[in-house]
């Protein structure tokens, strides 16, 4: 049996999912948290049972070693030879990587060079890649980029109206993120609609603590709300989304903060947390709003308002929409936010059933049968997309 492992390495964490391929059956999944701290947490699910241990895991290499040992100890695999492919999520591929790629030394160098575009994520992704290569050097490794799917955007979508030399010299442009998720739900939507993705106009709403909207026409990303970084676009859990750029020097002058500190505020203290003053967690805000907290209600309204702006502009951009898709933590689970987003879209031909909307995390249509525009909840599955790309590249390598 051939097995592929999908890896998402963060600065202090390592998420994994092991697949039997090509059947795409999930064998096990888990996460190593608090890597580098004394009380690291190792969690793995075996035969439906979640096993949690608190152990000292000083670095990613030890985390990988431990993960592989646990797979043997729990009899998930008989030997390391059963793992025939490793897929790594990499946040930023820039223009260099328009698609997933076989990892060699040059690819690692290129990903490291792109770290200035994603300083929080790419270095951690590379650490994960190197740790696996050291322990399983002969297994096919593949990098799957969050930005790759959006590389089909036309220049009018990705260029900022800045001096063109900034794009040529520094790579300043819109890149977009959550690409693996947008790609998965768009392909799955086509399956559910029974139509080729090539003839569909889709609006995909990846709404989680980080959130982005994408306009997908003919299976290709035409535009997306995140920009040069994942800070742009709609209001999010702790991120501001789009603001007037002149606010940055203004805030610096008023508060005495450095540019770096203001950026920190925009990334970590803004969005729903900033407006509400309570929490970045949507569930807390829904509870508070229900109790009559005006600021919690306002934070939710701002979130929905920004989503509406993208839905309207992207519908115009594609000259219509065939389906709106909700995915990720909020999109899949919050009937409240879906209702607020869908209300007022009747002019576009969106007719949805409030009774169908009362679900959490399951794949289903929310529209009435006669609705010209379909509305679908599709739980995202980035790990499966990673495993599929590994399979494709492994078979062609």
From Swiss-Prot:
Residues the UniProt record annotates as site (Transition state stabilizer): 178, 239
First-level EC class: transferase
GO molecular function, one term: ATP binding
Cofactor note: Mg(2+). Can also accept Mn(2+).
Active-site positions on this chain: 146 (proton donor/acceptor)
Catalytic activity entry: acetate + ATP = acetyl phosphate + ADP
Cofactor: Mg(2+); Mn(2+)
List of residues binding Mg(2+): 8, 382
PROSITE patterns named among the record's database cross-references: ACETATE_KINASE_1 (PS01075), ACETATE_KINASE_2 (PS01076)
A Pfam family of this chain: Acetate_kinase
A biological-process GO annotation: acetate metabolic process
Chief location of this protein within or outside the cell: cytoplasm
HAMAP family reported for this sequence: Acetate_kinase (MF_00020)
PANTHER family (UniProt xref): ACETATE KINASE, ACETATE KINASE-RELATED
Subunit note: Homodimer.
Protein name: Acetate kinase 2
Name of the encoding gene: ackA2
């Amino acid at each position: 049996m051939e097995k592929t492992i999908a890896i998402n390495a963060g600065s202090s964490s390592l998420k994994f999912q092991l697949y039997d391929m090509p059947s795409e059956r999930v064998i096990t999944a888990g996460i190593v948290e608090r890597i580098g701290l004394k009380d690291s947490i190792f969690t793995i699910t075996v035969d439906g049972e979640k096993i949690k241990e608190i152990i000292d895991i000083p670095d990613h290499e030890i985390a990988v070693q431990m993960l592989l040992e646990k797979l043997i100890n729990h009899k998930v695999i008989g030997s390391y030879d059963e793992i025939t492919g490793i897929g790594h999520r990499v946040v930023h591929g820039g223009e260099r990587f328009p698609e997933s790629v076989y990892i060699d030394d040059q690819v690692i160098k290129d990903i490291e060079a792109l770290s200035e575009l994603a300083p929080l994520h790419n270095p951690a992704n590379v650490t994960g890649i190197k740790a696996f290569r050291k322990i399983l050097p002969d297994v096919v490794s593949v990098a799957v980029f969050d930005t790759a799917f959006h590389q089909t955007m036309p220049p009018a979508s990705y260029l900022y109206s800045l001096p063109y030399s900034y794009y040529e010299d520094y790579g300043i442009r819109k890149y977009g993120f959550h690409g693996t998720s947008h790609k998965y739900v768009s392909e799955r939507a086509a399956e559910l609609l029974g139509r080729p993705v090539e003839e569909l106009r889709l609006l995909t709403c990846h709404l989680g603590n980080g959130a982005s909207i994408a306009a997908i026409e003919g299976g290709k990303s035409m535009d997306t709300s995140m920009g040069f970084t994942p800070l742009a676009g709609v209001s999010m859990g702790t991120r501001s989304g789009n603001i007037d750029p002149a606010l940055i020097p203004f805030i610096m002058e008023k508060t005495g903060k450095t540019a770096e500190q203001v950026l920190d505020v925009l990334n970590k203290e803004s969005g729903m947390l900033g407006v509400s003053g309570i929490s970045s967690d949507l569930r807390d805000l829904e509870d508070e709003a229900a109790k009559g907290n005006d600021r919690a209600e306002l934070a939710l309204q701002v979130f929905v308002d920004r989503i509406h702006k993208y839905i309207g502009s992207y519908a115009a951009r594609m000259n219509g929409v065939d389906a709106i898709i909700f995915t990720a933590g909020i999109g899949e689970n919050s009937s409240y936010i879906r209702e607020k987003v869908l209300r007022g879209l009747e002019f576009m031909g969106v007719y949805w059933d409030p009774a169908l909307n009362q679900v959490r995390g399951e794949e289903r249509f929310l529209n009435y049968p006669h609705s010209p525009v379909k509305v679908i909840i599709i739980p995202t599955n980035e790990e499966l997309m990673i495993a599929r790309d590994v399979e494709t590249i492994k078979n062609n390598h």
